[in-house]
Amino acid sequence: MELVLKDAQSALEVSEATFGRDFNEALVHQVVVAYAANARQGTRAQKTRAEVTGSGKKPWRQKGTGRARAGTVKGPIWRGGGVTFAAKTQDHSQKVNKKMYRGALKSIFSELVRQDRLIVVESFGVDAPKTKELKAKLDAMQLQDVLIVTPEVDENLFLAARNLYKVDVRDVAGVDPVSLIAFDKVLVTAEAIKQIEEMLG
């Protein structure tokens, strides 16, 4: 199959296995959920009444003071006491094997092609790290909500895009399922397309 280059009167021959396969919604959902889960730190932690530092002594005698009876200063109704159902550190990570991950990326790229959301250009960049220059380029292409994928990190492009809302720049190695589906359009250079094909086999 062929992908038409937007900035040149030509087309790029690509593998149908990577850019023309059926959309596997269940697989994409599983990989996206796992990717988001793996980004979680899971370091939230609170202390129960057994773990709070403090004396185990009864604060005052049971009867005769006129105050409510109390057996510990570490109970959950006390300020500085333990938490009733204390949160503990958790490992939220989910295993996704390489075949599943690559399959999900292929499904996403294929769906982007079908929906005309994948824009392929011969090359894309800016001469200086100027947001104004990049904004003018994107406006000329009628792109506001876009992920730009280049073969390798272009510092000028990265710095120029940093202050633009709903614009992000990634190299091929930094592409992930969540970022691909988060943007309205995905702008990819011809060289990056070749690298994606090699990466996804």
Curated annotation (Swiss-Prot):
InterPro entries the UniProt entry points to: Ribosomal_uL4 (IPR002136), Ribosomal_uL4-like (IPR013005), Ribosomal_uL4_dom_sf (IPR023574)
SUPFAM superfamilies for the chain: Ribosomal protein L4 (SSF52166)
Entry's Gene Ontology BP terms: translation
Stretches the record annotates as Disordered: 45-71
UniProt keyword annotation of Signal present: no
Any matching Pfam family: Ribosomal_L4
Keywords: Ribonucleoprotein, Ribosomal protein, RNA-binding, rRNA-binding
Molecular function terms from GO: rRNA binding; structural constituent of ribosome
GO cellular component annotations of the record: ribonucleoprotein complex; ribosome
Superkingdom: Bacteria
Chain's role: One of the primary rRNA binding proteins, this protein initially binds near the 5'-end of the 23S rRNA. It is important during the early stages of 50S assembly. It makes multiple contacts with different domains of the 23S rRNA in the assembled 50S subunit and ribosome.
Family: Belongs to the universal ribosomal protein uL4 family.
PANTHER family: 50S RIBOSOMAL PROTEIN L4, LARGE RIBOSOMAL SUBUNIT PROTEIN UL4M
Subunit and interaction comment: Part of the 50S ribosomal subunit.
Record protein name field: Large ribosomal subunit protein uL4
